[in-house]
């Protein structure tokens, strides 16, 4: 640097002075406190665009319209944590926890910690205590359900701008909760979109204000896509013919290696969530591990006519399915593929 010789302190001295300052704690850029791991969704399309899932010690926001798959996706993160022997916490502000459905989604509800707070303040304490105790993941369901205690202090509860209170409370909660992520847990908030009024063009917003987006390290937007119908009932408007819907997921923000602004489609069925075999087959097609020509599908030395045929084959041959899963994960996480699988 110019004129460095004329300065009283050398670069090394300045470096050591800053690191040893007891008033403000500083570390080197390679300190282990910055290291993190990820919690996989174990839904290959989502793991692909996030490069392995959501980061621990960070804040993730899942938002979108009603019945668009947000809570189901969050439940799969909890399922992954439980399978790894960790602790998952669900803060049920909407009072919508359904043990039967969560069990059907793969959760061990006997090992789930569930809070039912009535106010934002109670929710804050539940989340803070969970993170400080070392919980692996804490789900807030949802931001739209946050009710500041001040709402209850007014007899009428009307005319006191509760929306502004909610936004202020949520942003203050995040200011105080983000530092608690140093304990190693992942904080995940679910939020819902709302239509704005008074604009020429309808625009979406969400409870809690725009400030919450700046706190996020990972932000995903969910919408409900096309209906999945029974075989031969394509295009039917009869509800009895609908088996599920497509979850459209877009990664809007990711500070840890995700494919930002990428959108994926996940087929979701009412009776059992996601058919993982079919899902991996579809992702393997995208990765070039399985080849399709017209109605024919080719994998290694085998060929199949139609999607149902190849999916059924993998369901009946667990060894081949495990190899497909390993090859697919390797491809979308590292960009490498096994040549023998193509």
Would you name each region that the model predicts?
Residues 2-6, 45, 60-62, 83, ...:
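Catalytic phosphate/metal-binding cores of nucleic-acid and nucleotide-processing enzymes, i.e., regions
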């Amino acid at each position: 640097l110019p004129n460095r010789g004329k300065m009283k302190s050398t670069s090394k001295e300045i470096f050591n002075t800053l690191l040893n300052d007891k008033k403000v704690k500083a570390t080197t850029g390679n300190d282990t406190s910055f290291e993190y791991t990820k919690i996989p969704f174990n839904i290959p399309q989502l793991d692909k665009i996030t490069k392995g899932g959501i980061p621990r010690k960070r804040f993730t926001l899942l938002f979108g319209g009603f019945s668009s798959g947000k809570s189901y996706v969050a439940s799969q993160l909890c399922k992954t944590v439980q399978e790894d022997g960790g602790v998952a916490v669900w803060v049920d502000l909407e009072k919508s926890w359904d043990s039967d459905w969560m069990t059907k989604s793969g959760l061990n509800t006997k090992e789930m910690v569930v809070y039912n707070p009535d106010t934002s303040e109670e929710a804050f304490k539940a989340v803070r205590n969970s993170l400080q105790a070392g919980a692996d993941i804490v789900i807030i369901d949802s931001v739209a359900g946050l009710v500041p205690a001040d709402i209850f202090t007014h007899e009428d509860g009307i005319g006191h701008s509760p929306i502004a209170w909610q936004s202020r409370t949520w942003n203050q909660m995040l200011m105080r909760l983000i530092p608690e992520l140093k304990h190693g847990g992942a904080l995940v908030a679910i939020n819902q979109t709302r239509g704005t009024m008074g604009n020429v063009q309808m625009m979406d917003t969400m409870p809690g204000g725009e400030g919450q987006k700046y706190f996020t390290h990972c932000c995903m937007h969910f919408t409900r896509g096309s209906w999945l119908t029974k075989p031969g009932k394509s295009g039917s408007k009869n509800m009895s013919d609908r088996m599920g819907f497509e979850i459209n997921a877009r990664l809007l923000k990711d500070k840890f290696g995700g494919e930002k602004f990428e959108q994926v489609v996940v087929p979701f069925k009412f009776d059992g969530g996601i058919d993982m075999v079919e899902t991996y087959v579809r992702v393997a097609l995208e990765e070039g591990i399985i080849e399709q020509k017209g109605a024919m599908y080719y994998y290694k030395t085998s060929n199949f006519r139609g999607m149902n045929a190849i999916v059924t084959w993998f369901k009946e041959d667990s060894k081949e399915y495990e190899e497909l899963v390993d090859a697919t994960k390797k491809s979308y996480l590292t960009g490498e593929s096994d040549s023998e699988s193509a």
